[in-house]
């Protein structure tokens, strides 16, 4: 993590910079680099749901499914109406061969947001 000087250490501004840099790393397909930056942000701001959601996405992209599951679950404890987090948790369960848990969260995502991708994954017809 960047430090502004040896005596002051990380600041809220450097945490914002690290968060934005982590977004860019994830977009550039470097999820492990994103996780490294977000670890410091979350250590300083454990209540930051956006940082946790981004770290969950990075874990998922790095195929670190247990940590992704944990982070998505924490996000959903705080934001139970977050359709994307339900969808992403469902995809995580799907990749772990846990279809019943995946189905539940796919359906919750679709119920919260009628996004065509969520509706297709929910498979309400089955």
What are these regions (language model features)?
Residues 1-17:
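Long, contiguous interaction/recruitment modules in multidomain scaffold/adaptor proteins
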Residues 44, 78, 95, 111-112:
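Structural marker of alpha-solenoid helical repeat scaffolds
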Residues 28-36, 62-74, 96-108:
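Structural signature of tandem alpha-helical TPR/SEL1-like repeats
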């Amino acid at each position: 993590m960047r430090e502004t000087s040896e005596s002051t250490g990380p600041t809220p501004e450097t945490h914002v910079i690290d968060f934005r840099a982590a977004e860019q790393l994830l977009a550039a397909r470097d999820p492990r680099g994103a996780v490294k930056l977000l670890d410091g942000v979350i250590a300083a701001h454990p209540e930051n749901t956006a940082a946790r959601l981004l770290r969950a996405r990075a874990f998922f992209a790095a195929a670190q499914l247990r940590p992704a599951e944990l982070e998505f679950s924490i996000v959903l404890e705080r934001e139970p109406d977050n359709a994307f987090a339900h969808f992403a948790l469902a995809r995580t369960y799907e990749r772990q061969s846990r279809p019943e848990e995946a189905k539940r969260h796919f359906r919750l995502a679709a119920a919260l947001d009628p996004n065509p991708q969520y509706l297709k994954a929910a498979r309400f017809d089955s």
